[in-house]
Amino acid sequence: MIRNVTIPSLQQTEMLLQQRRTRLFLLVPFFGTGYILSVVFHLLSWKSGTPPSTWVRLFYYDGLMLITYGALWLLLWGETHQRGPSPTRTFWSLTVASLLFLGLGYLVLRIGRPSGDLALSTPVSGFAYETGVPLTWAAVVQMNVLALLEALLAFWLLLQLRGLVLFKRTRQSERSWRWMLITMAGSALLVDLFQPGEFVLALLLSLPVGLMLRNAFRVAWILYLTFRQKLLNLGLTVLATGALSGTLAFTSGPAHEYVWHYSPALSSFVNLSLAFGVLYLVTSFLSLLFHLPTTGAFQRKVDELAALHALMQLVSQVFDVERLTETIVRLPVEAGVAQAAWLALPDFQ
């Protein structure tokens, strides 16, 4: 007996993943198993002292990374997609997350170092120069932990900024955001196949950079902030920009070697995400600064619209006899003039 097999649509899949219990049941095993297998992969490489073949790394390991961190992205997306856009909460959470990452990253890089060596700028390489195989167990631990921390920060950053970029969302803005993520992931997956100076690599990176610039100017949420809120967010953007810039310097500096040997695609995606975060914060700071003088005029416009809306409601109530009589009776009681009120109307019938 042949049965029809129905494939769920994209909307049905999103609705399924929005259910927290279902999401955890489906995605946590994928992420946990994939991450453990990646740790085992690098431990075997360290024990054998020989690098895996190109085909094994391309089809097995890169595919494993795609499934593992794809599951992590969906897990974080499910926890944050229902939150409304709040610039104050977003900038503050990014500042705290960046500082927490820097502190944990510093502690991870201290693993295996002498207790008296406090400078992380000392060029201590834990990988073979020609093969890239980890030379010590500490390098295996560092590369796996730093990769997870960087992925968590990059995914959290993008998911937090998503609410601000898609404020007053349109179909065009959603399409631009999705294409930015797709080009960032696509160029990161292909970056290991080309040399740094090749024209094709520069062309691949130009696509996400162009879309990053386009999405960085989507700051429509600024128009709906009060003067006090704009001042508060102005200070928070400075803090978040400084913390995120320090994080980008850390991921492209001391931690770059470890995450690059873990996965060049993940390292490239993280750096692109952090660069977009810094770009969006700088754009937000400049936009907030330029919108400060116009706050009063915008607030007056909002008040005028509110007064006009109230007038329209009052006019509509005048033409509604029942609502008009109800308002006349209710107002003296609400004003405290009388404890009770009534209205006698003649019956013209």
List each language-model region with its residue ranges:
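Alpha-helical transmembrane spans of integral membrane proteins, capturing the lipid-embedded, hydrophobic core
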Residues: F31, Y35, D62, L66, ...
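Hydrophobic transmembrane alpha-helical segments in integral membrane proteins
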Residues: L26-L27, P52-L66
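Juxtamembrane segments at transmembrane-helix boundaries
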Residues: N4-E14, L43-P52, I67-W92, L100-S252, ...
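Structural signal for the N-terminal portions of transmembrane helices
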Residues: E257-G277
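Helix-loop-beta substructure at the N-terminus of cytosolic sensory domains
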Residues: S86-R89, F167-S176, D192-F199, V318-Q349
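Signal-transmission linkers at sensory-effector interfaces
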Residues: G112, V270-Q317
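N-terminal membrane topogenic signal
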Residues: T13-T33, S173
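Non-cytosolic membrane-interface motifs at loop->transmembrane helix junctions
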Residues: S53-L58, F199-L203, S263, S267, ...
